[in-house]
Amino acid sequence: MTVTVKMLVTKVKLDVVYATDDLLEKEITTSDISRPGLEMTGYFDYYAPERLQLFGMKEWSYLTQMTSHNRYSVLKEMFKKDTPAVIVSRGLAIPEEMVQAAQEEGIALFSSRVSTSRLAGEMSYFLDASLAERTSVHGVLMDIYGMGVLIQGDSGIGKSETGLELVKRGHRLVADDRVDVFAKDEETLWGEPAEILRHLLEIRGVGIIDVMSLYGASAVKDSSQVQLAIYLENFEAGKVFDRLGNGNEEITFSGVSIPRIRIPVKTGRNVSVVIEAAAMNHRAKEMGFDATKTFEERLTRLISKNEEGK
């Protein structure tokens, strides 16, 4: 995903000090944010100009103690053509030399009243998610009881129809057909729709329907964490399926593993209700309530009791 300076400005609500239309369209290529330190003393070895440059109270205080000439020289050296933008936090007064250097070198300059640490966190969160490598997978992503569930299966097995039934039951559609998944961190997987498919469901025999138009804004969601994968497969006599729910199967996307449950599909089975139950059961397991474990413990106690009675 391409991220521009304008997108960052809109997301974190930065105030424009200096920026042309061309500078607002400049691409941000890394989520790393630099807070200049040694650079202000004139040491530029290992300086990373491709990063956003963030000035907080410490950096601003050091700058204000410099002479006007030195301040201008350092800032002009710091502002490179690869630098996407410079931001000054905490509503601090921006030195004239900084504005002059930004204009001469063609660098967008912004200010914010937000504290430095909070602003850095907001920008990093947005950039990490936006710049993360996307993997497109086939399936339907639903928000079921607040849990992101990725429904997959063979073509024509009824994934979209199941998604529609879940929407009618009060759950929310995130994406249909193509789901773009990405890792926000080492343990968190998120999914979102392709822009062209946002809020749309394709139902065989009906065509494409706009879920938001038919069922309202409460029936859709722009993105969701992906916490559970469900794979729908045709029921086959003699094929072994997990009946106790202790298979512990996982699937990995973008380096993040999530649990996967296989659900056999056959005529007359209400798949949407089964998926609801699977989502609630998974949440219960995360909270420490494992029905399978409880059953196994009861079975063990019963066997022990029967053996003692012999």
Swiss-Prot record:
Family annotation (CDD domains):
HprK_C
**Residues annotated as the enzyme's active site:** 138, 159, 177, 243
- Region of interest (Important for the catalytic mechanism of dephosphorylation), ranges: 264-269
The catalytic activity, as recorded, is:
[HPr protein]-L-serine + ATP = [HPr protein]-O-phospho-L-serine + ADP + H(+); [HPr protein]-O-phospho-L-serine + phosphate + H(+) = [HPr protein]-L-serine + diphosphate
Query: Which positions bind ATP?
Result: 153-160
* Any further remark recorded for this protein: Both phosphorylation and phosphorolysis are carried out by the same active site and suggest a common mechanism for both reactions.
The protein's name is HPr kinase/phosphorylase
Native organism is Streptococcus equi subsp. zooepidemicus (strain MGCS10565)
